[in-house]
């Protein structure tokens, strides 16, 4: 279904409710440059990591968490890349999103979804975690706490994927990056009003960090190896490995 939510001002903060869930896939594809390419790239690195050295002895089979899984797109990409038996757990606090995810992945028997606040979940030991365009919605004070929980729950050599909208620490460059991104959205069919109304709704809801800040945050919780797998202007995909 086409995203037309912001044809007029919602006069409220952005939230992942039923209206958003109905159009969310279209919103993602038209709002995040190279969205599917980043999903496939992230799935490839998790698949390679599992194949090479992360089948941890204490795990009956590899467990992968997708936090803020929304409509389940990343699990589709993972199932296309990974041939071995795996367990996929998607956690999201939006039931409308999870209903969409369950519909899309009903034919996969290795997936389960839980409607919970992932900040309160006690994770099992896992081979991989993903936070794809999610950390930017977590309150800044809670980000380090969440990442430390993830780090402590990762098996040795396990990986964390982090996809984020980012900002530049240089005011002029940041303005230019935002302008280019808005041009991208216009080319995807969004009007000036839609872009402005969505920006208004996301104010103080989506709080981006710079690339440097995100990497420093990952390193602060224990990750010694963090790489940018992909970057387009103000979007990036990071991989962090526990060693």
Swiss-Prot record:
NCBIfam families cross-referenced by the UniProt entry: carboxy-S-adenosyl-L-methionine synthase CmoA
A Pfam family annotated for this UniProt entry: Methyltransf_25
A biological process from GO: tRNA wobble uridine modification
Catalyzed reactions: prephenate + S-adenosyl-L-methionine = carboxy-S-adenosyl-L-methionine + 3-phenylpyruvate + H2O
Assembly: Homodimer.
Enzyme class: transferase
UniProt-recorded name of the protein: Carboxy-S-adenosyl-L-methionine synthase
Enzyme Commission number: 2.1.3.-
Similarity-based family: Belongs to the class I-like SAM-binding methyltransferase superfamily. Cx-SAM synthase family.
Chain residues that bind S-adenosyl-L-methionine: 35, 68-70, 92-93, 199
Native species: Helicobacter pylori (strain J99 / ATCC 700824)
Protein task: Catalyzes the conversion of S-adenosyl-L-methionine (SAM) to carboxy-S-adenosyl-L-methionine (Cx-SAM).
Xref: HAMAP family: Cx_SAM_synthase
Superkingdom to which the source organism belongs: Bacteria
